[in-house]
Amino acid sequence: VSLTSGYVSGEGDGKKMPVVMHSYNAANGSVAWAPKRMDLFTIPSAYDPEPLPWSTMLSVHESRHITQMQFGMTKAQKPFTWAFGQMWNILVSLVYPGISNMEGDAVITETAWTPSGRGRTADFLNYYWVAFDNGDFRSWDKWRFVSQVNNAPDYYSLGYLTMGGFRYLYDCPEFMSEGYHLAARRPYNLGAFYTTTRKLTGKKFNKAFMEVCDTMYTLWKADAEARKPYIPSEPVTSKSRFYTDYSNNLIAGNDIYSIKKGHSDAPILVRIDSAGKEHRVSRFAYDAGRLQREPESGRIYWSETSTDKRWNLQTKSRIRYIEKGSGRKHTVDNPQLLYNPSTCRSYIAAVRYEMGGKSYIDL
């Protein structure tokens, strides 16, 4: 996990690190106190699960972050920690490599060292594929700092495309190690990773990134050509002025129910009729599962995750539904963590997660 980062866990301060397991929260992980403690939130995602056990994915990904943060406690960077403490380490991690490159490097690690990893999922770089195919080639900064008009994937995807592309195209698996050691030796070089890019690729950072984009588009285009012919399609909704995303589509008779959201809009449930006219149904949760319609009653069910009002490290899941022709939401009360309901007449089947890691089907 640590080899190509140039550091190992504990190299900066020579101490062991506690790992705290949280089994009451949504899937996530963090390296706190920069880096003095690892927190693993072990309940796997019910809406975007990985084929590998979530605890394994977390262990590999967060362990890489531990090694990444060691450089701020070594060489010429170390004296600054005497004055600024742990704040300095997190600051230099954001200034020198940046959050995108750090997360992209960690995704490369989880992909390389496990049979799964986000780098192997089909939708992780899919937006770039579609964007390039429509002539949408942007500079790195425009992909990173999006606007209300132009969308972009999160910094995990951008970092993976960048770091993975450099490794693939220029054969430099030691890229992060070179950058970290340069930043540790010469704190005054705030562009240490730009310097490393020029050294290992012979090009400026943005030019090297654009070459990665061109190369990936060539590979993706060849793959797309081999998959022809495609099913023809046409737009159902009109083009919005600002970026808008329609997801979780559900066909109900002549209507389509969809979750609409964008950079300037919170998620809402909308109904699109056969004429393409959009009707607002209700506000919607940010973290929710797919829509499921019960044919006889016309009810639409889903599950959503919410944070406990008192304990913000504890999350709850509840099953909700709306009646046909209504926007009022109802809740199926249950103290368990229930996800992804499926309905048949008066019965509801749902997946139940246990704190210990087991899962069941509840009826």
What is each of the regions a protein language model found here?
Residues V1-L91, A106:
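Juxtacatalytic substrate-recognition/specificity segment
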Residues P18-V20, E174-G179:
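Extended, well-ordered alpha-helical scaffold segments
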Residues P53-L58, G72-G164, L169, S177, ...:
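Acidic/His/Gly-enriched intrinsically disordered linker/tail segments
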Residues R118-D123, Y243-Y246, K260-L269, R283-A288, ...:
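A flexible loop/linker signature enriched in serine peptidases of the S9 family
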Residues D273-G276, E323-G327:
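Short loop/turn segments that connect beta-strands within beta-propeller blades
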Residues P295, I300, T343-R345:
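Repeat-blade elements of multi-bladed beta-propeller folds
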